[in-house]
Amino acid sequence: MGLLIGDDLWAVVIFTAIFLLLVDLVHRHKFWTAHYPPGPVPLPGLGNLLQVDFENMPYSLYKLRSRYGDVFSLQIAWKPVVVINGLKAVRELLVTYGEDTADRPLLPIYNHLGYGNKSKGVVLAPYGPEWREQRRFSVSTLRDFGVGKKSLEQWVTEEAGHLCDTFAKEAEHPFNPSILLSKAVSNVIASLVYARRFEYEDPFFNRMLKTLKESFGEDTGFMAEVLNAIPILLQIPGLPGKVFPKLNSFIALVDKMLIEHKKSWDPAQPPRDMTDAFLAEMQKAKGNPESSFNDENLRLVVIDLFMAGMVTTSTTLSWALLLMILHPDVQRRVHEEIDEVIGQVRRPEMADQARMPFTNAVIHEVQRFADIVPTNIPHMTSRDIKFQGFLIPKGTTLIPNLSSVLKDETVWEKPLRFHPEHFLDAQGNFVKHEAFMPFSAGRRACLGEPLARMELFLFFTCLLQRFSFSVLAGRPRPSTHGVYALPVTPQPYQLCAVAR
């Protein structure tokens, strides 16, 4: 068979183009109804891929919301997406319509990152029996190993002591606190998953954290969106390895830790940690093809805990110290409250939180202002729903825009400024706020929220009890514009720490 040339080649090109346009037209036809949310006109085949800045999604969605309203649509290649904005709409979606919107969209890239038919972890698992099984296991096991109890609080307090000692060694010169914060929070997760802590100088520990940090954004950027929208590209030999090198390296490191841990597991003894508890469930489930307890899922549950439990908390603490050096008046008031309630002799305890309204307000405001997971993790409709006057078909990807809630101008007095008074009443008492949802809401709310709250309070108060933090003299003030990824991190900065 000869090569196509001349008119024959052009005929094939034109036919292919017309075919793709017809496929695109048929695919989006059901969404072109009077009751489907409005949005920018998609390009054939590409949809709105070129109209959304995936390196700064919050700003792109902010501009689109100002034009199309609180509920608007996008099309990413052939994938329909609806974005929900504002407190009222987001809460209604996640809570009132929680049963119908708790599913996850199919993200083909994760099939090349260890996900399979019976191995989807917890965070990205479809809403169904396997997700319920793994979430129930995770919640109950976290509780069994101390979340919400004095035993884990003591572990966190001990780790906070190690962190403060390391800060004291670094205090002779300016330093970036982010990596030390990551090590401290990672050791809390390691205590739950592996029943051990790592020395901060441990080479394997440092390699693992460095790889994890370098992986930020690999699965959330523009290329990842293109591959999810056009998954046939993932069949190109070698491409997934080139697009996700650090994520694959981190998975390999987790596998190495799990292999070593299994060697010391004794099923006749009580479980030492979550990994032992999972292995025990695997043993019970032998011969049950429907069980989600398997080696592949063990790896993903552990990765979920590191990603959701370590990365978010350490990033929030990094934001907290940045905001303290930029707002010395706020830092001074935190110092005063710590001195009054706790003093300088004993370590902070969770029982102190109720008597420290200003410190509690500061921590909440850090979470609101930092806004580290602005677009949430995508949801998906499991049936057709009528929402806010629109018809959203089954199988539509949903983006609950948490940033639009945490920065809602109709709710917060100073939405774009760091203002701890958002969480204080006129008498200085701490007040909860329904628009405070950094952990999301509804059925997919973060299962590690109780642990995160404990860590944030204990690490933050321990550090502020022992140190005063400041910007470097004669240097430009650090920026509060974050680096967009999952999570949103502060731009690299340094601080000075002085023992109190």
From Swiss-Prot:
Record GO biological process: arachidonate metabolic process; female pregnancy; response to genistein; response to xenobiotic stimulus; xenobiotic metabolic process
Quote the catalytic activity from the record.
Answer: an organic molecule + reduced [NADPH--hemoprotein reductase] + O2 = an alcohol + oxidized [NADPH--hemoprotein reductase] + H2O + H(+)
Print the keywords alphabetically.
Answer: Endoplasmic reticulum, Heme, Iron, Membrane, Metal-binding, Microsome, Monooxygenase, Oxidoreductase, Phosphoprotein
Q: What does the record say about induction?
A: P450 can be induced to high levels in liver and other tissues by various foreign compounds, including drugs, pesticides, and carcinogens.
Q: Which Pfam families match?
A: p450
Domain of life of the native organism = Eukaryota
Q: Which CDD domains match?
A: CYP2D (cd20663)
Could you tell me what this protein is called? Cytochrome P450 2D26
According to its UniProt entry, what is the function of this protein? Cytochromes P450 are a group of heme-thiolate monooxygenases. In liver microsomes, this enzyme is involved in an NADPH-dependent electron transport pathway. It oxidizes a variety of structurally unrelated compounds, including steroids, fatty acids, and xenobiotics.
Record organism = Rattus norvegicus
Give the E.C. number(s): 1.14.14.1
Q: Name one GO cellular component term.
A: endoplasmic reticulum membrane
Alphabetical list of PROSITE patterns matching this protein:
CYTOCHROME_P450 (PS00086)
Subcellular location, record wording:
Endoplasmic reticulum membrane; Microsome membrane
